[in-house]
């Protein structure tokens, strides 16, 4: 295992290994897709860390999990690294299902410090002597959960070592007061001068030489520069740094010094996101998550959101857009360029984004809160308490709904229908096509008078933005019967409708644009004409759209058979969208087999 080999290597050998790993990560990610820039920035950091701490004994927790590719390579997964993010291959994130050295599964930002506290307390109660190390960066420290946990370190007498991987970025550039504070620390002329002095000292020392005085110089210099207590020290933590995150020898010495300290320490490490790959260094936001190379350029729903909002906002000055550190990912960077004064990136603060939007809406604005489905889960209380309870006019643009593919179970948007359905005042819209998406946005923004959620997939498509926007119009947000048949009625919501339309059977097909409220008039018509109704949704089946329809049919006194098709009670793995839909039985082939089975069964009962 490379984990053992690196401890015997010279620093020159480690530098060569770092470049080999950098080349390997770049080649694999450009082929498979994945988080490129973040991982290129943490290679030397990981090598130095694992020369001092051992993940077989010490709990090393990687926040968010997308910066841990080197960790995977070092911990016995080098031979499988080429399979990362492919169906049946390695996950793109840290997961306990993959290795016992992945101490805590991650995918969402800001969880590591709280998890570290939990492990530390468990070790203490069980009498186990282990270190707890947290590596947090890419903006995760700005999340509320991370700050809450930081505030508990002193209270719980923690000895945790926190490695702050500061690359000045999350997915987009960091924002907020803490980001500004860290920027001041790493750009101080005193720090830069101290860094040069330390480099010269290290060049003259033997490898085993203690660097106490030099470290003290840096620490005292930084304290003088700040003119008082810095943010971390105000919480009772010991702060060290900032240090060059690409200097293995320096980092190893620092980690050795703090390893056995009996108090919580923050080691501030400055890294270059995308280091070693020019394109990623120059545009780390674009290469935060790279798509597989060689694919033709297509238009995404996210980009379409940005273009649509930008166009509508030219006439409607009340439209504002809000995102949580994902301006590019959500397509709102397009809106930002045209309407910078009405764009708000609040960092990794989903809860704050929702409440911020609620207040804007209550005072006459039309806020659009664009957040990935999986991350909106983090603001559920705010959706209920701050938005829905007050009937605040907020449009939730829920990106990445449904099966998202290679990012896997931490990122699939399969719960949004289920957690939004029971919320009073909430309307839920699930368009089936780009045209329907644009027209739904336009219609909702024209008449926004309460909370509305529009959910849409990660899918891309061939299409012209101008053509879609030129034909933008208000539409009826009800259901439509697209095809009439005799053997059964299928009601589908969202883009999964496109799979349903491929079913080669004599069935009625209904496009359920609105998940809530249900179109009772169309539902009654379908119930009158059919004894077998099948619902299809790209979401969790339990408590979802199908359950809602079944409940309404029961209330109507309908005596037929209803079948709900969706995602069963499981966490969907990572893989290509087509592969996953096939696995779930939600592609056209799987749906055809299932529908035919129920038609035949109903026929044997003499009901069809």
Curated annotation (Swiss-Prot):
Broad EC category: transferase
One Pfam family from the record: DXP_synthase_N
Biological process, per Gene Ontology: 1-deoxy-D-xylulose 5-phosphate biosynthetic process; isopentenyl diphosphate biosynthetic process, methylerythritol 4-phosphate pathway; terpenoid biosynthetic process; thiamine biosynthetic process
PROSITE patterns recorded: TRANSKETOLASE_1 (PS00801)
Co-factor remark: Binds 1 Mg(2+) ion per subunit.
An example Gene Ontology molecular-function term: thiamine pyrophosphate binding
Record-listed Mg(2+) binding positions: 138, 167
SUPFAM superfamilies to which the protein is assigned, alphabetical: Thiamin diphosphate-binding fold (THDP-binding), TK C-terminal domain-like
InterPro entries: Dxylulose-5-P_synthase (IPR005477), THDP-binding (IPR029061), Transketo_C/PFOR_II (IPR009014), Transketolase-like_Pyr-bd (IPR005475), Transketolase_C (IPR033248), Transketolase_CS (IPR049557)
Pathway annotation: Metabolic intermediate biosynthesis; 1-deoxy-D-xylulose 5-phosphate biosynthesis; 1-deoxy-D-xylulose 5-phosphate from D-glyceraldehyde 3-phosphate and pyruvate: step 1/1
EC numbers on record: 2.2.1.7
Family listed: Belongs to the transketolase family. DXPS subfamily.
Function description: Catalyzes the acyloin condensation reaction between C atoms 2 and 3 of pyruvate and glyceraldehyde 3-phosphate to yield 1-deoxy-D-xylulose-5-phosphate (DXP).
Protein name: 1-deoxy-D-xylulose-5-phosphate synthase
Primary gene name: dxs
